[in-house]
Amino acid sequence: MIATISAPTHTTVRSPSQPHLSLLTRSDIHETMLKDTIRTDAYRDFIYNHKSLFAGKTVLDVGCGTGILSLFCAKAGASRVIAVDNSAIIDKARENIFNNGFSSTITCLRGKIEEVVLPVEKVDIIVSEWMGYCLLYEAMLDSVIWARDRYLKPEGLMVPSHMNMWVTPIADPDYVADHIAFWRDVYGFDMKAMQAGIVDDAQVLNMPASTLCAEPFPFLQLSLHETTVKDLVFKKKWNAKLTTGIDAMDGFIIWFDSFFMPSREDEVPEDAKAEEWGKAGKKGIAFTTGPKAKETHWKQGVMLIDNVKEKPLSRKEGEQLSGELEYSVPEDNSRALKVRMTWKFDEDEKESSQSWNMK
């Protein structure tokens, strides 16, 4: 079981910022997402491989973007698809849908899902690509949950259905040398001032699997049929055992796995790994954004430890550490994310802690 320490109260639906919405109208952003074949193929394969689930059904696409998921659903036989987006990209989606001959099946609506008036009372399926960096940065999950509670039939299906989140410590002296130690001597000059922010802000990078110095720990599962808004801020316990000796622990990385299950009764173990799901012959579709698989546009969230303040200790294989991981939302930016970690090696007396911003 994944142990929960506490879940701070968080019940209001976050509102997207205008800069965030303007970014979503740019073609290059959508090109990047569509060319992420791990992401797009997973949605396509689940929908096309389960046409019987979509045939004759009413589908709601929350945050439809270019309309690609709505088009998949219509082509799979959905009788009606309602595509909703709060940015100007909806005009492009409407044109894409018309050009592909699905205007009679897909209805496009611009506005917040909480404010638009749908032409139906209930839907059979909600499909959405809402995930952000570290899963919840600039994510639309608040709105998807609202749509589920308002529009999804009791027997309805969420696509995707489950998210498993992972954390593990990393040791990457090459990255530290290139991006942190570099500034200490630039052609003989001290430019440490340029390091500002690199250990304060989470980085979005695709890390080599070789940088992992422990087995990943599954710290959170979201079951989209049941998750509530207050579940999106949390503190979780985690632990790890070093699988190799290291000169210093340089940080942590966070990623998520997505699961698409054909029935709301289907369960996904909290420690299920997406990269092993299909190989094990499990039903549904799964993909990972982790470092041991093909890169996705989400990459991983990298939290570098500020080892300048205190010289880190070398560690031996087999040493164990544990701590807490916290996600919170800053009051002044509802789309931002603050990640806080605490950690302590069993051999140490002192616990360490650090926070990182994603904004």
Regions inferred by a protein language model and the residue ranges of each:
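Class I SAM-binding transferase module
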Residues: I2-V62, T66-E326, P330-K359
